Amino acid sequence: MSQANAATKASSDVFFNASLEDIDPEIFGAIRNELGRQRHEIELIASENIVSRAVLEAQGSILTNKYAEGYPGKRYYGGCQYVDVVEELAIERAKKLFGAEFANVQPNSGSQMNQAVFLALLQPGDTFMGLDLNSGGHLTHGSPVNMSGKWFNVVSYGVRKDDHLLDMDEVARLARENKPKLILAGGTAYSRIWDWKRFREIADEVGAYLMVDMAHIAGLVAGGQHPSPVPHAHVCTTTTHKSLRGPRGGMILTNDADIAKKINSAVFPGLQGGPLMHVIAGKAVAFAEALKPEFKLYAKNVVDNARALAEELKSHGLDIVSGGTDNHLMLVDLRPKNATGKRAEAALGRANITCNKNGIPFDPEKPFVTSGVRLGTPAGTTRGFGVAEFKEIGSLIAEVLDGLKVANSDEGNAAVEQAVKEKVIALTGRFPMYGYQG
């Protein structure tokens, strides 16, 4: 073997066999540190969850090497016979999980899935209705800073000021006055049950499509803990992470064959090129997990834990927007503790409790300050926390916020936060992740 060939072989051996730690210790170190953070912190961000090792393996597989523009059986590249199997499994499992006739599993994100529906069903300048961001909606539901708010005429609906519940009379009135082409239901910070039937009645009355973005509650729908929008909506979108516990990505469901064709064309070639086959594999695995009986117990535990956390926080003098929760999340009004969301997020973070600042309905504070935090139970429930643990977590949160109130500064109360941090590390140590003990 020549020196050149030997060098090429050695280089090839390194390329195919060397570990990440050997090739890129900086990235390896960042990932290792993030794993440590996840192991030793309590994750309360409502949109986050923890995937199984099987999902990690699928998403980190050699499927990342394969281009597969098009759909199963109709690809623009050769060599797709095995990725076709993967995508077909994902589609069939999604349809079974949600009782839908059609599923597109290619959207790369929640924003892109919603954009694809707009591309399929609307024209620039058309009117659609969506939940106001300040009432718990999403950027893609018509926020002026988002494409959805720039390309379309948006009419926003909201919650009532007295009880922070959806004002369905207002939805009906706005629909009659504005004759939208599409009504979008669903949100990112609404803790109560959605009345899909009433939304469909309003949509039918004005001749609008009903689109439901169930990204946050899809796992609860799949687990039987929230009414399904699929029988009522013309089209449903959902992310595949959050309460569904899969990889980060999106999905679109419908029971209408004509809409399905428009959706498929909007996703590809309208919005995306080659799908991420390794992510679709992860989606398929997560859907299979969600079809198992134990996922129904998981979904029930998510809701039970959220209610326990909300009640514990209320017992410590905090206000919960709308008075409580029917799903996986809650908005905590911090004003009784004279705290802002910005300060609370930072203080809780120093105590190893991760959450996000969040505006509350009719919030007097600026969006980057806020009067509230949003808390969710999917990740902690995946980890194994039950009602007892979430009551303890609620008490720890109150302890930090009380310390913050005494300190009355951005720096917080170091002694209280350190004491809580030690309790958090002890708690998380009892619920190891990915086979790790300690």
UniProtKB/Swiss-Prot annotation:
What Gene3D superfamilies does the annotation carry?
Aspartate Aminotransferase, domain 1, Type I PLP-dependent aspartate aminotransferase-like (Major domain)
Q: In which pathway does it act?
A: One-carbon metabolism; tetrahydrofolate interconversion; Amino-acid biosynthesis; glycine biosynthesis; glycine from L-serine: step 1/1
The Gene Ontology terms for molecular function here are: glycine hydroxymethyltransferase activity; pyridoxal phosphate binding
- Give the enzyme class: transferase
The EC designation for this entry is 2.1.2.1
The superkingdom of the source organism is Bacteria
Annotated residues that bind (6S)-5,6,7,8-tetrahydrofolate are located at L133, G137, H138, L139
Q: Which GO terms describe its biological process?
A: glycine biosynthetic process from serine; tetrahydrofolate interconversion
Keywords per UniProt: Amino-acid biosynthesis, Cytoplasm, One-carbon metabolism, Pyridoxal phosphate, Transferase
Q: Which CDD domains match?
A: SHMT
Regions annotated as coiled coil: none
Q: Which cofactor(s) are needed, names only?
A: pyridoxal 5'-phosphate
Indicate the family of this protein: Belongs to the SHMT family.
State its role: Catalyzes the reversible interconversion of serine and glycine with tetrahydrofolate (THF) serving as the one-carbon carrier. This reaction serves as the major source of one-carbon groups required for the biosynthesis of purines, thymidylate, methionine, and other important biomolecules. Also exhibits THF-independent aldolase activity toward beta-hydroxyamino acids, producing glycine and aldehydes, via a retro-aldol mechanism.
Q: What is this protein called?
A: Serine hydroxymethyltransferase
